[in-house]
Design a protein with these regions (language model features):
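Outer membrane beta-barrel strand-and-loop segments of large Gram-negative receptors
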Residues: 296, 418, 427-431, 472-479, ...
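Surface-exposed extracellular loop regions of Gram-negative outer-membrane beta-barrel proteins
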Residues: 224-237, 277, 281, 294, 513-515, 544-590, 610-631, 744-759, ...
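Short acidic/polar hinge/loop motifs at secondary-structure boundaries
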Residues: 149, 155, 182-208
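Short, acidic, small-residue-rich periplasmic hinge/interaction motif at the N-terminus
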Residues: 31, 43-47, 81-83, 100-142, ...
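Transmembrane beta-barrel wall of Gram-negative outer-membrane proteins
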Residues: 25, 242, 246-274, 289-336, ...
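Short, acidic Ser/Thr/Gly-rich low-complexity loop/linker segments typical of extracellular
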Residues: 49-65
C-alpha cells in the first residue's frame, strides 16, 4: 500500500513538472456587485465562436481571480455562472499570436430569482474543490430528495453511512456541524438529520479548517448552506415525503423579500425511521467457565425533529443586521426485540441453556430553543469590514430513558431494569471578526471567540423485584453531575494572491477550562490548558486549467460528556456502559495535497491525505459479569491514515453525466493500552459510481452504486459491503411541482458485519436493513414574480436544472 501511494505521488508530481508554468492568455477576477466581496465559487466558461460547448472551464481562487492559459488563437466569449447571480456573458474578444486579455474586475449582479425559476439552468457539478474545502451541490442529487443532509452526503467521496445510519468521513465520525456558519442545535449525524435536503443549497466539507474555525472535530467541519435567493415579494416551498419504512417528513419555507429587508418562516415535522434485522453471537471466557450468547431479532430507530424557525434581516448600503430564532422538540429513539439463547458452561459441568426475549426501549430527547444576532459593517468596497455575532441555545426537559426487560417464551417477566437521566443544557457563543485588506489581493483577518457549554442533571436506576412485582430504585446507583466547558479563542490569518500563487497562513490560541462534578466519590475533575493551533493553505494555478492545493491543519477532539460519565448504564441486559472521567483529548495533524484538472465540461481531481492522531479515543468492550459485556471509552494509542481520493466527472453526451469517486487509504493503529487490544492495520477503500440521465425536459433518472471496503479497530474488524440505488424525478406545472421516487439498496446487498476477537471475548454482529426501502417525495415551489426573460437567451445547453 505504501509503495502504491509513493508511486501515485510520484506520478502526480511528474504531471505537475510536465505542466511547467506559462504566462496567462486570459484573466480576470469576480466580485459581488453589491458589496464588493471577492467571489470564489463560480463556474467560468470559455466559448469559442460558433461553438455551443465550452473549450475550457475553471473556478476562481480565494481572491476571485481566474486564469486561462494554453488557449489557441481565435475569437472567444467568456461566461460566468453562479447560483443567485445574473449570468455574465462578455462581448466577443480576439486572441492573436502574442495577445493577452485582462478582463479586469467582473461585477456579478445578485439575481432576484425565486425557488421555482429553474429555466435558466444546466447541470450542476456535484463536487467542487476549493482552497480550504470541498463543496457538495445538493439539488442535483436525486437520492437526497425528501431526506436530509445525510442523504445528500451519502454520494460524496470518502463518506460512509454505517448500519445505524451514522455518517463517517474517512473512517471518523469526529466532525462539527454548522448551519449557515452557526453551530447546529444537535451534534454529529443527528445534526445532519435535522436539515431537510430540499432547503439545502450546498454543503461545505472543510477537511483542513483554517485558524478562523473551531479546532474541534477530528476530520473537520461540515457547514450546511441553506437556500436564500428569492424573488422580491412572497416566495416559498413545501416538501412532503414518505417511505415504505414509514419514514415521513413535511417541511416548508416562506420568504418575503423587500428592497432592503427580508423575513422568513419555516418548519418541519420529521420522523426518520431505520429498520433492520440483527444477529449476535458472542462468547466470554472467565475463570469459572464460558458464557455463550446466540441472539437475533428486529431493531428500529427514529431520529425526529418537530420545529419552527424564523428570521429577519436588514441590508443597508454598508451595514447588515440579522436575527434568527428556532425552537422545537427533537431527539432519537431505539427499540429492539431480540431472542437471546444463553448457554453457560461452568466448572466443568454440562452446558445449561436458557431462552429469553429481550425488549429494549431507548429515548434521548429535549425541548430546544436557539437564537442568534449578527451584524456586519463595511468600511469601504475593498473588503475592509468588521462583524460580530451572538448565539444562544437552550435545552430543557432533556431526558435520556432506557427500559429493558427479559421475559420467558411464555411472556412472563424474568427480570427488568430502567434508568432515567434528566438534564438541563445551554450553550453560548460570541464572535468578533475583523478583516483588513493590505493590498488589492492580500488581507489580514483577526478575531476573538467565546464558547461556553453547561449541563446539569441527575441519574437514577430501577431494577425489577420479582418478590414485590415492582420496579424499585437503586440508591447506590443515584448520581448527580455538573459539567462546564469554557473556551476563549483568538486567531489571526494572512492570505494573499500573487499571479498564480495563493497562500493562507493562520494561528489560533485557545484557553480551555473543563469542570466535571459528580456525587460519585473521586470522580470529579477540573482541567485547564492553553494550546496553539496553526494552519496553512497553499494554491498554485497551472496551465491547461490545472491547479494544485496544499493544506495543513492541527486540530483536537475534546471528550464529550457521555465519554466521561462515571456511572453504569445498560443498553440491554447483556450490554453495560460506563464513562471514563480521565479520558484525554485527541490531537490530530491533518495534511492534504489536491490536484485539479478541467477539460471542457469535464473535470478530474486527486487528493493525497495524511492524518496522524495522538491519544486516539476508542470504545473498548470487555467481559463484565457472566455473559454481560462492558463498554467504555479509552485513549488506546496512536493511529495513522494515508491515502488517495480521486474524483472524475464526465459529460459524454448532452443527456448523460457520470461521476466516478474512489478513496483508498492505509490505516494503522498502534495500541498502547493493555485491554485486549492489539496493533492493527488495513487497507480501506470505497468506490462510488453516480450516473445522471436526462430523459426529457422535465424528467431525470439517477443510478448509483457504492462499494465499501473492510476496516479494522484495535479489537476487531468490519467486512466489506456494496449497494445500489435508483431514483427518478419528474417536474410538472412549469416545474413548480416535483415528484421524486427513490429506491435504496435495490438488490438488498447492504449488510454490516463486525467481528471482535480478544483473549477473553469473541463477538460477531451482523446487521441487515429491512427491504424494500422506497421513498416518495413531492415538492411545490411558488413565487410572485417570473424569471427575467433575458436570462433564457443566455442559457446554453439547457439540461434539467442547476447551474454548471
Amino acid at each position: 500500500m505504501k509503495r502504491l501511494l509513493f508511486l501515485l505521488t510520484l506520478c502526480l508530481f511528474s504531471t505537475l513538472l510536465y505542466a511547467a508554468p506559462t504566462d496567462f492568455r486570459i484573466k480576470g477576477y469576480l466580485v459581488d456587485a453589491k458589496n464588493g466581496a471577492a467571489i470564489d465559487f463560480a463556474d467560468v466558461l470559455l466559448f469559442q465562436r460558433d461553438r455551443t460547448t465550452p473549450i475550457a472551464q475553471t473556478i476562481p481562487d480565494g481572491q476571485g481571480q481566474f486564469l486561462f492559459s494554453q488557449v489557441p488563437n481565435g475569437t472567444y466569449t467568456l461566461m460566468v455562472r453562479l447560483v443567485g447571480y445574473d449570468i455574465y456573458a462578455s462581448k466577443p474578444f480576439e486572441l492573436k499570436e502574442t495577445s493577452r486579455i485582462d478582463l479586469g474586475k467582473i461585477n456579478m449582479t445578485p439575481l432576484e430569482v425565486g425557488l421555482s425559476e429553474v429555466e435558466v439552468v444546466a447541470d450542476k457539478r456535484q463536487l467542487i474543490y476549493k482552497l480550504d474545502k470541498k463543496v457538495v451541490e445538493a439539488s442535483s442529487n436525486l437520492m437526497g430528495d425528501g431526506g436530509s443532509a445525510v442523504d445528500v452526503l451519502e454520494n460524496t467521496p470518502s463518506v460512509r453511512v454505517d448500519a445505524n445510519g451514522d455518517i463517517t468521513f474517512r473512517g471518523s465520525s469526529g466532525f462539527l456541524v454548522y448551519v449557515d456558519g452557526k453551530p447546529s442545535v444537535f451534534s454529529g449525524t443527528q445534526a445532519l438529520e435535522q436539515v431537510p435536503a430540499g432547503q439545502i443549497e450546498n454543503i461545505e466539507i472543510i477537511t483542513t479548517p483554517s485558524a478562523k474555525h473551531d479546532t474541534e472535530g477530528e476530520v473537520g467541519i461540515i457547514n450546511i448552506i441553506t437556500k436564500k435567493h428569492f424573488l422580491k415579494g412572497l416566495s416559498g416551498m413545501v416538501n412532503l415525503s414518505g417511505s415504505t419504512w414509514l419514514t415521513r417528513r413535511a417541511d416548508f419555507l416562506i420568504n418575503q423579500q423587500n428592497n432592503h429587508s427580508r423575513w422568513f418562516l419555516g418548519g418541519q415535522w420529521a420522523d426518520k425511521l431505520s429498520k433492520s434485522e440483527h444477529v449476535l453471537k458472542s462468547t466470554t471466557y472467565r475463570e469459572e467457565g464460558t458464557y455463550a450468547l446466540d441472539a437475533d431479532g428486529p431493531q428500529e430507530g427514529n431520529r425526529f425533529n418537530y420545529s419552527l424557525k424564523g428570521g429577519w434581516s436588514l441590508e443597508l448600503p454598508m451595514t447588515t443586521f440579522e436575527i434568527n430564532a428556532e425552537g422545537g422538540h427533537g431527539g432519537r429513539t431505539h427499540n429492539g426485540d431480540m431472542i437471546y439463547r444463553e448457554t453457560r458452561t461452568l466448572g466443568g459441568n454440562a452446558p445449561v441453556t436458557a431462552v429469553y426475549n429481550n425488549n429494549n426501549d431507548f429515548e434521548n430527547s429535549e425541548d430546544f430553543g436557539q437564537g442568534s444576532i449578527a451584524a456586519k459593517h463595511r468600511f469601504n468596497d475593498k473588503g475592509h469590514q468588521i462583524a460580530a455575532s451572538l448565539y444562544f441555545k437552550y435545552g430543557g426537559n432533556s431526558l435520556e430513558y432506557s427500559f429493558n426487560e427479559l421475559t420467558d417464551m411464555q411472556g412472563k417477566r424474568a427480570d427488568g431494569m430502567c434508568y432515567y437521566e434528566a438534564e438541563f443544557r445551554n450553550t453560548w457563543r460570541a464572535n468578533l471578526d475583523y478583516t483588513l485588506p493590505i493590498s488589492e489581493k492580500s488581507k489580514l483577518e483577526a478575531g476573538y471567540q467565546y464558547y461556553s457549554y453547561f449541563e446539569d442533571g441527575d441519574y437514577e436506576m430501577e431494577w425489577w423485584n420479582p418478590e414485590s412485582g415492582e420496579f424499585e430504585k437503586q440508591p447506590e446507583a443515584y448520581n448527580t453531575f455538573f459539567f462546564r466547558e469554557a473556551i476563549n479563542s483568538i486567531y489571526a490569518i494572512y492570505s494573499g494572491t500573487w499571479n498564480r500563487f495563493d497562500a493562507q497562513i493562520g494561528l489560533r490560541g485557545e484557553h480551555t477550562m473543563t469542570k466535571l462534578l459528580s456525587s460519585i466519590p473521586d470522580a470529579s475533575r477540573i482541567n485547564k490548558r492553553f494550546e496553539v493551533f496553526p494552519s496553512l493553505h497553499l494554491g498554485y494555478s497551472l496551465p491547461r486549467e490545472q491547479k494544485i492545493l496544499l493544506a495543513y491543519s492541527y486540530r483536537t477532539t475534546r471528550p464529550q460528556l457521555w465519554f466521561m460519565e462515571p456511572y453504569l448504564t445498560y443498553n440491554d441486559f447483556y450490554s453495560a456502559v460506563i464513562g471514563n472521567p480521565d479520558i484525554r483529548p485527541e490531537y490530530i495533524h491533518s495534511m492534504e495535497m489536491n490536484y485539479q484538472k478541467a477539460f471542457g465540461e469535464n473535470s478530474f481531481s486527486a487528493t493525497l491525505f495524511h492524518r496522524f492522531r495522538k491519544d486516539k479515543v476508542e470504545r473498548l468492550r470487555v467481559p463484565y459479569e457472566g455473559a454481560v459485556t462492558l463498554d467504555s471509552m479509552a485513549n488506546v494509542g496512536r493511529d495513522y491514515s494515508t491515502g488517495l481520493e480521486v474524483s472524475l466527472n464526465l459529460h459524454p453526451t448532452r443527456w448523460w453525466n457520470t461521476t466516478l469517486n474512489g478513496n483508498i487509504y492505509h490505516y494503522k493503529v498502534v495500541n498502547e493500552l493493555a485491554a485486549g487490544g492489539k496493533h492493527a492495520s488495513s487497507t480501506n477503500y470505497d468506490f462510488l459510481w453516480n450516473n445522471l440521465f436526462t430523459l426529457g425536459k422535465y424528467t431525470r433518472l439517477q443510478l448509483d452504486g457504492s462499494f465499501v471496503g473492510p476496516s479494522v479497530t484495535t479489537q476487531g474488524k468490519s467486512d466489506a459491503y456494496w449497494y445500489a440505488n435508483v431514483a427518478v424525478r419528474q417536474q410538472l406545472f412549469n416545474r413548480r411541482l416535483t415528484a421524486t421516487l427513490a429506491f435504496k439498496d435495490v438488490f438488498r446487498s447492504a449488510r454490516y458485519i463486525n467481528d471482535i476477537q480478544t483473549a477473553d471475548l469473541s463477538m460477531y454482529t451482523k446487521i441487515r436493513p429491512k427491504y424494500p426501502q422506497i421513498l416518495l417525495t413531492v415538492s411545490y415551489t411558488f413565487n410572485s414574480f417570473k424569471a427575467k426573460p433575458t436570462q433564457e437567451k443566455e442559457d446554453r445547453n439547457e439540461l434539467f436544472e442547476g447551474i454548471k
